[in-house]
Amino acid sequence: MNWDFEGRVAIITGGSDGIGRQTSELLAQSGATVIVCARGLDKLEATRAAIEAAGGKVETHQLDVSDADAYAALVADVAARHGRLDMMVNNAMSVHYAPIEHLTLDHWRKDFAVNAEAVFTGTKAAMAVMKPARRGSIVNVSSTTAIRAAPFMSSYSASKAALIQFTAVAAMECAAHNVRLNCVVPGQVQTAGNEDFARKAPEIAARTAEAIPMQRGGNPEELAAAIAFLLSDAASYITGIALPVDGGKSAQLYLPS
């Protein structure tokens, strides 16, 4: 699927790996100028090189999204330099795997800082640009663990659930200004984060894969396509939704025997 994002400007956090990198590359291939943000410099530079080699327009910024002042300043700077901000994808994530009795308050706060509070920061800053311009689309990346319980992921699950409801509220506040906000809700996707989970909890990961109705995990390209759709004019009458992209897992009532 080819999307027409020519002339548009997009900010993607967590944009140098997995779902974020695939989204960055897809938007650039479709004509957008992509502002790729992540913490790790090496992966940022690799992403920049790949996009430029394919003829895309890209900037990279080393950013910890939990630094609210830095994130808000970046959004304002991008909008000022480019004269617009059309799209935002909040994909940066933090996860701690532990039983609740072993989870520390620092772990809890870190996951909320990245998965929920940073989405608030980025969305608020983007709204200040998009609402007066009467154009814009924001996609926030949640998780099926936000709507289905997963052991040992309490802080991650709770923060991703908060993200879904925040997105819906922000969508209602922005709808009259022609600014749309939606979530994608990935299931098991072949990313570094899920591979890390599989190493730490192999039995749970194996059972999760077996229980997917489509009998396979997803790949980052499939998530990037869903994100691009929600960002695009093809979704111009869609706002406030949480779109599962999970092979049917969240729709399933009973696990297979």
Regions found by a protein language model. Give the residues of each.
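Residue(s) in the substrate-gating loop at a strand-loop-helix junction
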Residues: S143
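Active-site helix of classical SDR
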Residues: T123, S159, T167
